[in-house]
Amino acid sequence: MNSISSNKSNNSKPPRVSASKISKLNPKNLPIIELKSITKEYGDKTILNNINLSIKDEEFITILGPSGSGKTTILSLIGGFEYPNRGEIKFFGKDIKDLPPHKRPSSTIFQDYALFPHLSVEGNIKYGLKLKRVPLTDVKELQLKTFENKVNIWKKTADEKMLQLDKIQEDYRQKLQSSELTEKQRSKFQKWIDDSDFHYSYWENYVDLKKESYSNKYLSRKLTNKEMDDIVKEMLELVSLEGHAKSAIQNLSGGQKQRVALARSLAIEPNILLLDEPLSALDAKIRQQMQRLLSNIQKELKLTFIFVTHDQKEAIELSDRIIIVRDGKIEQFDTPKNIYDFPKNKWVANFIGYSNLFEAKYLEKNKVSFLGKTFDTVHTNFENNTIVDALIRPEDIIVSDKEGLIKGKVKEWVYKGSYYITEILVENVLFIVESTKFYDIDQDVYLSWELDSVHLMEKMEGVSDNAKDTEKI
């Protein structure tokens, strides 16, 4: 019988497929992860409300928000530790919400490391590798032909099932259009649609699951001990833990444990690495080292990182884009620079960094009024005489004891090492300013700024202006 052969020596290195190579199998250039109309509820409480977002391959994404905003829930939904009530979780265009965590293209690092204390560093890293399979290098042509025939049968079955579900869902949606439905009937039909959508997700992945099962049985093999040892060595070098393979977990520092957790997750070659506040328990110096390590590894391996944190500085320094979450909704999803310089609304401006916020009136093109004076602005996108929110960042304000646009009085200052954070009262509005020069309490000073330093936003109610943040000041 003819066969397809190559070197099968146990000393050869197993085929290592990086996430960047896998993404090249995505000819339509689809997002690696897409959440579409995701809703998550616990009883009567809505945790996520109709979330939509799209993440590109090889991005470093940070989910940032206050406690209870829903950021960890988003991560858990992507990882398969939670299931949505409705909506789609798409991986390269295919809904994976029905798949359990071990069938998803992701690996997760938790805040508490989740290492096995009875295993050594090497044992922890090998844990996932013992389940990993690599393609056989000597497969009979008849076996490949059988596999191809089975794939065609599986595809036909899946297509028929999805067509049936399409018709069922359309029927339910038509029934939902009736104005005569009671709330109970409407809820019942919506639940049927939600349940059938999970069935649809299963059949979307049916062929891949069958192919994996067949391949594991007939077309692949487990890694040899030598191959696992090589991968462990490679991972320890990657996370700078050479020489610690035999170390006991309880003998490691917090930073070293986090590196082991990182090595274990990367060893199984996920497309997506999910990180749930992994650095929050580390001291400042070790935390900075781990931030650099994560950034370097993400760039080197060209993986997609989705990182949850409450640390704004960490998010700005590490991310390609940041998802700002508030009360189960996405307030803004943009680059760190755009979120800082051009926040969507007053809440985002207040949440990210120091902010000088006050009510203003957009008078006409390039003219805005606040604090009883009229100033020039770069903005041209509002209707005349519209009430808006105005933002000036502390570092954009120029302080002088001689002249400026407005006059104020120094009320408080905090020394930050290379600069001072100074509070200046202007017309009963408290300004926060960064300055390298020291000013005495109650000293009169003048403030000015460049034309493009004033950012105008649509008026947002229910969020205070210039609320003093004691953690920041």
Curated annotation (Swiss-Prot):
One of its GO terms (molecular function) is ABC-type polyamine transporter activity. Residues 1-13 have a biased composition (Low complexity). It catalyses: ATP + H2O + polyamine-[polyamine-binding protein]Side 1 = ADP + phosphate + polyamineSide 2 + [polyamine-binding protein]Side 1. Its EC number is 7.6.2.11. InterPro entries: AAA+_ATPase, ABC_SmlMolc_Importer, ABC_transporter-like_ATP-bd, ABC_transporter-like_CS, Mo/tungstate-bd_C_term_dom, P-loop_NTPase, Transp-assoc_OB_typ2. ATP binds at residues 65-72. It comes from the Bacteria. The complex is composed of two ATP-binding proteins (PotA), two transmembrane proteins (PotB and PotC) and a solute-binding protein (PotD). Belongs to the ABC transporter superfamily. Spermidine/putrescine importer (TC 3.A.1.11.1) family. This is Spermidine/putrescine import ATP-binding protein PotA. It comes from Mycoplasma mobile (strain ATCC 43663 / 163K / NCTC 11711).
